[in-house]
Amino acid sequence: MNVRLHNTLTGQKEPFEPAEPDHARVYVCGPTVYDYAHLGHARCYVVYDVLVRHLRADGLKVTYVRNVTDVDDKILKRAAETGTEPTVLAARFADAYSEDMHRLGNLDPDVEPRVSTHLEDIFALVQRLVDGDHAYVSDGDVYFSVESFSDYGKLSHRDLGQMKLGASERLDETKAARKRHPADFALWKKSEEDAWGWDSPWGRGRPGWHIECSAMSMKHLGDTLDLHGGGLDLVFPHHENEIAQSEAATGKPFARCWMHNGFVEVDKEKMSKSLGNFFTARDLFDRVEPEAIRYCMMTVHYRAPLNLDWTLDDAGNVTGFPQFEEAERRVAYLYKTKQRLEGLPPKRVVDVDGPVPPDIAGFAEALRESLDDDLNMPVALAKLADFLKAVNELCDQAMRKKGKAARRAVEQAQAGFRALEAELGIGTESADIILLRIRDRRAKARGLDSAAIERQISDRTEARKSKDFAEADRVRDELAAQGVELLDGPEGTGWTIAD
């Protein structure tokens, strides 16, 4: 295995070397389930899904843990706004999140722990920190003492002496007064008797956000993780605080490698509800194929920002997303190529000597090498484009008059598609089904009725049978004017929407 990844802790691209050479323990911070998954979530979990797929394709056993934060102040706030019980709201959005991840083609993690089922583990870790003088109780809250951990700031490269109070604490002098140092953070938060919370050794309350991930990750993966991942926004304070409390408790390195993906931006601004440029994955599912969203997330390096453009009508309504639409065209091309390969007549595939086209023969290896190099998905997609071009040329050769395709080349092309599915998680669906969905969605977007188009094609077929070629041409031209391209073949007439 020759995987090299950028380690946020060192700022260097390094060989990925799990503690056990054949087993990688991977933890990724999951969502706080108070709303639907947004495009930032989509990007994050596609990135780590590709990572896990690639490590497994390289022969590693991977234990992949991705949590669900179903206890958090944001959930409590949203529940109050909507008049919903917090546990009910969290469960609903957790289920929706899982559905969205499946639609994006992400594999289930091996373990998906929830905070609500790990409270005893959280209690034990907090008590361990209190007993070790790394945490203290203050009026029912429990805080981690950052001054007790000499390496605080090593991930984010921040100096403790320069850290200031957060905005919420500048407004809450009572909370600030409970702390020994302004940067101390809550491990346990006191709550009123009638508020959402749990009984603990320190009174009724709720766990702090940071301690949740430490407790869950160490419960399922041990004291030292091989890789901890998440979005760039989690470097500080979340991951910095995870390191502090975990290493203070165990005396061991918390993670061997830290990996962070970049933001999703719209018109070069970070997505924000206040700016009106905030989109959930579900906002896009009706506009483009979910696999196109997955593909689009791979078009820039995972550490760089993914900047999306949008188109608006005169009233300011969103009418399109050019990058996702282009990604859908590329996904359609992929499936059309796969469909052509699968549909080659057996009599056209023969045993002949000769070299296999290099972009077919070398595709699986080129794909692996691209992902070995800090998960370089844009390069992997460039290799895919070369592969698809070569496969189409192979199919063209086979379908010429008296044309043939070498069986070895066809088999290696089929192996290339299997590698694509295993490594990138694209090309996994039935070509017939996904192309039909894309076609019908494009027709609907143009205000066209698929059933009406089918009727017109049927009328044209009858006209051709009756040798009324003028009528057949009229129907063809009428459909062409609407952007409908007819595909005449030995098994009848199909259709597609022209780009």
What are these regions (language model features)?
Residues 1-34, 49, 99, 120-342:
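Alpha-helical recognition segments enriched in aromatics with Gly/Pro capping
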Residues 10-15, 19-107, 491, 495:
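N-terminal, positively charged nucleic-acid-binding surface of large information/translation enzymes
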Residues 60, 134, 484:
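Short phosphate-binding/catalytic loops that engage adenosine nucleotides
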Residues 270, 277-499:
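Structural preference for alpha-helix termini/caps and helix-kink/transition segments
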